[in-house]
Regions:
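A short, Lys/Arg-enriched amphipathic alpha-helix from helix-turn-helix/homeodomain DNA-binding modules
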Residues: 125-129, 154, 172-200, 207-209, ...
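A short, N-terminal "cap"/entry segment at the start of jelly-roll beta-barrel domains
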Residues: 1-23, 119-120
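N-terminal regulatory/effector-sensing and dimerization cores
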Residues: 17-116
Length: 277
């Protein structure tokens, strides 16, 4: 497995997390999860994180000689049926946490989990195991201040998941988290996340990455499976759509998202809808 050494001077996630704005709630059971109306319109897309205590009969393998203490499943809310059939086979107990992505960049992060992700952890992976254990203990034995504690633990666990996926990129799954594992591409992505309204072009983004235009464009496309221009359009459309949904005027939405005028944002939204048909 490839392990990426993180550059502590480059914060790859804070601007993204601010744009995603996750809100966490514990779902008490799979029955409750299945009772949710997935057909109703949802402004905020949702992920589900499932913490599992592995049964003592878990079988070690050459690839996993030391049985993991916990596992973590994360996927779309609509994947819950898959989750039931997959996880109940080998676990004793599950805790389901719903992460509503209330920020404008929520749909972009949802794309990263179009395929459910399984993570096996042990006590050495403290960024994941500590908040998972804390949540398990709190749900099993509630104490005063539980809602605040679960919110904070959910935040810590979610950040730990993203850090883990950025530090352990899957070469077969290009996308945002995979691209953030490359420090050069990450610099350009962070710049776009922090200032989407800036007049970005290929030259400016390549300069942020410290690469030539050609090398940057090629590396970005390989890591993201889309061009820098396409990602910037997707980012700005997400910001514009959320601004309009929240009641802002087209002029305000254009300013927030980086479009030069209301006519530009109207054309972009119309073009995006037409392309999806």
């Amino acid at each position: 497995m490839q392990i990426v050494q993180m550059n502590t001077r480059l914060d790859r996630l804070s601007a993204l997390l601010e744009g995603v704005a996750p809100v966490f709630s514990v779902i008490e059971s799979f029955d409750q999860l299945g009772a949710l109306d997935l057909t109703a319109p949802q402004l905020d897309p949702s992920l589900v994180m499932v913490i599992n205590s592995l049964a003592s009969k878990y079988q070690a393998s050459p690839d996993q000689p030391t049985p993991p203490r916990q596992s973590l499943w994360i996927g779309h809310l609509s994947h819950w049926a898959h989750l039931q059939s997959k996880l109940l086979v080998y676990t004793r107990e599950q805790i389901c946490i719903r992460a509503q992505l209330t920020g404008p960049l929520g749909p972009l992060l949802m794309e990263e989990f179009a395929q459910p992700t399984d993570l096996l952890t042990d006590t050495h992976e403290t960024a994941l195991s500590v908040p998972m254990t804390l949540i398990q203990q709190e749900v099993s034995h509630p104490r005063c201040g539980q809602p605040a504690l679960l919110k904070s633990a959910g935040d810590i666990l979610f950040i730990g998941i993203l850090r883990h996926l950025v530090a352990n990129p899957n070469p077969e799954r290009p996308g945002l988290l995979h691209a953030l594992s490359d420090v050069r591409i990450a610099k350009a992505l962070v710049a776009m996340h922090q200032a989407p309204h800036f007049n970005w072009n290929l030259s400016a983004l390549a300069l942020e990455a410290g690469m030539s235009r050609t090398s940057f464009a090629t590396a970005f496309k390989k890591a993201m499976d889309k061009t820098p221009g396409k990602y910037l359009v997707t980012l700005r459309l997400a910001l514009a759509r959320r601004a309009l949904d929240s009641g802002k005027t087209v002029k305000e939405a254009a300013r927030i998202s980086g479009y030069r005028n209301p006519a530009s944002i109207a054309r972009a939204l119309k073009f995006n809808v037409t392309n999806k048909r």
